[in-house]
């Protein structure tokens, strides 16, 4: 059934950089399948804007982490959400697509759905890991879920939520065999000798909590592994400025800080010390041994621990269904423990070969041409809506 060609409008919201990446991928697929006159608007980042998206609010207004840290931003977030809902109900786009950011988007999606506007959510929340009660909220809010991981549709189906497995765009973008030598040349690193990539996060709260520990761990590793070099990507000038006091406090470190280029930095590495998050999946797709770590404020950690279901938090372990790389979280994330675990990952060649096999299988499973599959699923929802009109 052909879609209308007159001013098709889709509203979208992405709340953080990883969502911006996913939404931009989806927008690219939609632009190939929908009329050229179609308009896309809402809240998004620079990658979405590059795809012709009209962002009415700055995406970083929605970027928060944890329960405690969010308190100071609640009034501004609620104001933006209220304005967005009023705009949606007044303009009635063909659909609303929330990309990740479930705490913000589910409320908007429910308002859209209640008003007869199809609601689509891209990225299933980790209901299989923690906060399983969210599935009731999903059932009330979401007409169709776009899932990044293959085990999610079966969980949603039990709750009566329509969904499509679309794979992960990172698996499409990252080559099956990373070019470590080329990455080292690009960063001006020696072709030989051990390199460890260190990624302590991109938020001020993350750097404050785990940055000093990561730098202390690097200092220990340099003592124990002469000749080791470190590479650390800084996504923005503000992040580089935030890291500078830690760099100044450890002048002995053989450390290269790159302007962005986190994927190149990880590709150049023999092992990675990384904070928990989507970046751990990227490290797995690059076939890198790693140590996953994270620290959150005590209260946030207690809430997450009480609501957790799985014994692991890192995506490589979740997707494998077992511990394939070590996780050192909260008070277990000491400089000594991080240094020991990371050096083990660096030196253990048998483990490296095993991880390459595990991560290659994972990569092939997630490589689904996500932009095309997600866009096709959205088009089907639009066609179904037109058929009922």
Swiss-Prot record:
Gene Ontology biological process terms, A to Z: lipid A biosynthetic process
EC number: 2.4.1.182
Pfam families according to UniProt: LpxB (PF02684)
Leading EC class: transferase
Catalyzed chemical reaction(s): a lipid X + a UDP-2-N,3-O-bis[(3R)-3-hydroxyacyl]-alpha-D-glucosamine = a lipid A disaccharide + UDP + H(+)
Alphabetized UniProt keyword annotations: Glycosyltransferase, Lipid A biosynthesis, Lipid biosynthesis, Lipid metabolism, Transferase
Domain of life: Bacteria
Pathway in which the depicted protein is active: Bacterial outer membrane biogenesis; LPS lipid A biosynthesis
This protein's record includes keyword Transferase: yes
Entry GO CC: membrane
One MF annotation (Gene Ontology) recorded for this entry: phospholipid binding
Entry's family note: Belongs to the LpxB family.
Cross-referenced HAMAP family: LpxB
Task of the protein: Condensation of UDP-2,3-diacylglucosamine and 2,3-diacylglucosamine-1-phosphate to form lipid A disaccharide, a precursor of lipid A, a phosphorylated glycolipid that anchors the lipopolysaccharide to the outer membrane of the cell.
Designated name of the protein: Lipid-A-disaccharide synthase
Organism: Burkholderia orbicola (strain MC0-3)
